[in-house]
C-alpha cells in the first residue's frame, strides 16, 4: 500500500453528504505510515461518478477510465479527505500516474487553502 494507490473501499457507516458505499479511494498518507503494521489509519480521498461532483470546481479532480485500473470516469473528491481503518480497503486497482497525483495534490491544496 503506497501513496497514490487506488483501492476499492467500503465506506460504511457514513452520514449526511459524506461519500459512502463501495467506491475507489486514493491513498494520501505517507508511505512510512502505510507500511507500518501497527499504524491502522490510512488517509484517503474518496472518488465519485456523480455528475453533480464533476462541476464543483478545483477541489474535484477528473480520473479517466483506465487510469490506475478504473472501469469508468470518476472524480477524486478532494474536499472530502477522510481517514479509514485499513481493513476497509478491499482490493488494489493500481497507482495514479505522476500527472494525476499532482492534480490531486492541487485539489487538496484548494480544499484546505494551502499555498502551492
Give the location of each predicted region.
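Conserved functional hotspots at enzyme active or ligand-binding sites that engage polyanionic ligands
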Residues: 1-116
Amino acid at each position: 500500500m503506497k501513496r497514490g494507490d487506488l483501492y476499492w473501499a467500503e465506506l460504511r457507516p457514513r452520514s449526511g453528504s459524506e461519500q459512502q458505499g463501495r467506491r475507489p479511494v486514493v491513498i494520501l498518507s505517507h508511505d512510512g505510515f502505510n507500511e507500518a503494521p501497527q499504524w491502522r489509519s490510512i488517509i484517503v480521498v474518496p472518488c465519485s461518478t456523480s455528475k453533480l461532483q464533476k462541476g464543483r470546481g478545483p477541489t474535484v479532480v477528473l480520473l479517466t477510465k483506465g487510469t490506475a485500473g478504473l472501469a469508468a470516469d470518476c472524480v477524486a473528491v478532494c474536499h472530502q479527505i477522510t481517514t479509514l481503518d485499513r481493513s476497509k480497503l478491499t482490493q488494489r486497482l493500481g497507482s495514479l500516474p505522476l500527472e494525476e497525483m499532482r492534480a490531486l495534490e492541487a485539489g487538496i491544496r484548494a480544499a484546505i487553502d494551502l499555498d502551492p
